């Protein structure tokens, strides 16, 4: 195919999800494109779901990855914001229509023509491959400026996990100093939700089924309180005390007990994605004027705002850096929940033979 450039990534070729070196092509650098050498890529749980086709729409070979930080190696002649050598980020999506109401209002995430960092179809009909690769080519609009004082690799998961928790806090008004926020789940999303909430000046209660996480939540992450959700005495005392709750848990679980923790007008925002329907007592919500909301990652403008906010307040993820030769072991550990709190792949230093 004309105007394609060879590169190398790590792809799954079937639903086993096993990742191996894979040579493929990306488009040549267009006039509005930024080409970057990938330095680091975060490992999101959705990557694991997708390489195993657990969502049902994976096409193989599949190069996953949507939390990418790299260094600019080439720019198109119409690119204005970046030059060769800049550190930049790439997140969950890499293109949108640019014209719909969502795009005009800087919430490209909800554009009906959104193109994801992998598994979407590019303009030339090829399948877009993700950040577990040596290079990427992205339109300038969807590339993020990376602050010099934001550490690598620990900042990398902000592009996915960070945006996922920051965006609903801003949209639903859960960013006002003095508010009381509950955070359900203390994983990759939850630990960043605690950090952002504390930077906003919120009182934070971590809600978990695991009593063993109390010390970590309070003494390491800075939460103000810890609630064991299976402890009836604790939950009784916490009823009607929270202005909002960010629920980061993807495993199916009951939501109604969480609503009891909210004050009247409180908001339960679900950012995890359970794969089973949930039951709601609508009358209970009506009587307390309580809201169930959802959210995905922020748009381009908001994600850049989040990155800059994180740099200003020293917010990064707690990460374990993984060499690419150990990527499949990392995926096995992720499936077991054996990570604190996020894996980041060291792609820049990887050597690969195809």
Swiss-Prot record:
Tree of life domain: Eukaryota
Tissues and organs where the protein is expressed, per its UniProt entry: Expressed in leaf epidermis.
Enzyme Commission code: 1.5.1.56
Class of this enzyme: oxidoreductase
Record field: catalytic activity: 3,17-didehydrostemmadenine + NADPH + H2O = (16S)-deshydroxymethyl-stemmadenine + formate + NADP(+); 3,17-didehydrostemmadenine + NADPH + H2O = (16R)-deshydroxymethyl-stemmadenine + formate + NADP(+); 17-dehydrostemmadenine + NADP(+) = 3,17-didehydrostemmadenine + NADPH
Chain positions recorded as NAD(+) binding sites: 45-49, 185-190, 214, 271-273, 295-297, 340
GO terms (BP aspect): alkaloid metabolic process
Keyword terms, alphabetized: Alkaloid metabolism, Metal-binding, NAD, Oxidoreductase, Zinc
Pfam families to which the protein is assigned, alphabetical: ADH_N, ADH_zinc_N
Chain residues that bind Zn(2+) 1: 44, 66
Family designation: Belongs to the zinc-containing alcohol dehydrogenase family.
The name this protein goes by in its record: Protein REDOX 1
Gene: Redox1
